[in-house]
């Protein structure tokens, strides 16, 4: 299953460059298969906490694939500095979770269709490297109208379309220093990689008992816009909305944490699915 971020320019009389986008979810709730896998990871983790090696860092082989319309920054041809800044944000955000991203290669492809998020499977068959333990991120100037999307882990057959599709697509303008106001600190990649580690949105399930299937993320009815401190959309449930969580939809500057329960889920997904 993939998770997509939809961004829509705010309606105003201002110029397009001055418009501030809103971040909206463009994805259905996790499938039953995703929920079953998440429940299994939770159960496995409770029975085998030591087997998850919490003291050992998870080192993720990572590849950056730059897809561009032409060899200009506006066309998606990102600079080495932008890519390094994005990698630094990823490692800083996941550092407290004891996760390290080791960039093993960067590819650059000028292809108008691929840069516009078309011909996804042929593109990924040409570029994707490694197994399910390898994170392939595709940066492109247009992601079908979204900020990004990624896949949850699953037990796919090597070489299948699902296996080839595994990875994340991220809008070029969302990298640190990009042109997308409020969403240009690199946190789109952080959020999407959370999905790659089997994390759901914090607002999944609303105020229901199951929620995002993480015990220490407070329930929330809907996604967050901006950074509204004190937001509480489930007043009958413990805690305020986790607006600072990377798996909400707050502004990039508002995001700063994963919970211990989310860290545990990521580690469980890594050892029980991604490195199996």
Curated annotation (Swiss-Prot):
Taken from the UniProt record, the cysteine pairs bridged by disulfide bonds within this chain are 227-254
| EC numbers for this chain | 3.4.24.-
Quote the record's binding site residues for Zn(2+): 191, 195
* Active site feature: 192
Query: So which domain of life are we looking at?
Result: Eukaryota
Q: Which residues are glycosylated?
A: 70, 102, 222
Principal place of residence = secreted
Q: Where does the record place a coiled coil?
A: none
Q: Which Gene3D superfamilies match?
A: Collagenase (Catalytic Domain)
Signal peptide coordinates: 1-17
**What does the UniProt keyword field contain?**
Disulfide bond, Glycoprotein, Hydrolase, Metal-binding, Metalloprotease, Protease, Secreted, Signal, Zinc
KW Zinc (keyword) present: yes
Q: Which GO terms describe its cellular component?
A: extracellular region
GO molecular-function annotation terms? metal ion binding; metallopeptidase activity
Q: Where in the cell is it found?
A: Secreted
Q: Which Pfam families match?
A: Peptidase_M43
Enumerate the InterPro entries for this protein: MetalloPept_cat_dom_sf, Peptidase_M43
Look up the record and give one Gene Ontology term from the biological process aspect. proteolysis
Described by its record, this protein's role is as follows: Secreted metalloproteinase that allows assimilation of proteinaceous substrates.
Family per record: Belongs to the peptidase M43B family.
Tell me what this protein is called: Extracellular metalloprotease VDBG_07883
Provide the species name.
Verticillium alfalfae (strain VaMs.102 / ATCC MYA-4576 / FGSC 10136)
């Amino acid at each position: 299953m993939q998770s997509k971020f939809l961004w829509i320019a705010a309606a105003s009389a201002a110029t397009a460059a001055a418009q501030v986008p809103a971040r909206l979810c463009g994805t259905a709730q996790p499938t039953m298969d995703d929920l079953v896998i998440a429940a299994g990871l939770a159960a496995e983790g409770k029975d085998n906490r030591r087997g998850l090696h919490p003291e050992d860092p998870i080192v993720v082989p990572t590849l950056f694939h730059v897809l561009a319309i032409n060899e200009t920054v506006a066309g998606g041809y990102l600079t080495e500095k932008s890519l390094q800044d994005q990698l630094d944000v990823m490692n800083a955000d996941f550092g407290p979770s004891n996760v390290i991203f080791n960039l093993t290669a960067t590819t650059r492809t000028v292809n108008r269709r691929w840069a516009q998020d078309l011909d996804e499977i042929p593109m990924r068959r040409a570029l994707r490297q490694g197994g399910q333990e390898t994170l392939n991120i595709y940066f492109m100037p247009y992601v079908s109208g979204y900020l990004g999307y990624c896949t949850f882990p699953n037990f796919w057959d090597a070489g299948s379309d699902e296996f080839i599709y595994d990875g994340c697509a991220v809008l070029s303008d969302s990298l640190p220093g990009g042109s997308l106001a409020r969403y240009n600190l690199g946190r789109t990649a952080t959020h999407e990689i959370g999905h790659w580690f089997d994390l759901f949105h914090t607002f999944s399930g609303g105020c229901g008992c199951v929620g995002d299937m993480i015990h220490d993320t407070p329930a929330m009815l809907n996604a967050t816009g901006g950074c509204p401190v004190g937001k509480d959309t489930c007043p009958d449930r413990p805690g305020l909305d986790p607006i600072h969580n990377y798996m909400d939809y707050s502004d990039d500057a508002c995001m700063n944490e994963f919970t211990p329960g989310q860290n545990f889920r990521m580690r469980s997904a890594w050892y029980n699915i991604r490195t199996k």
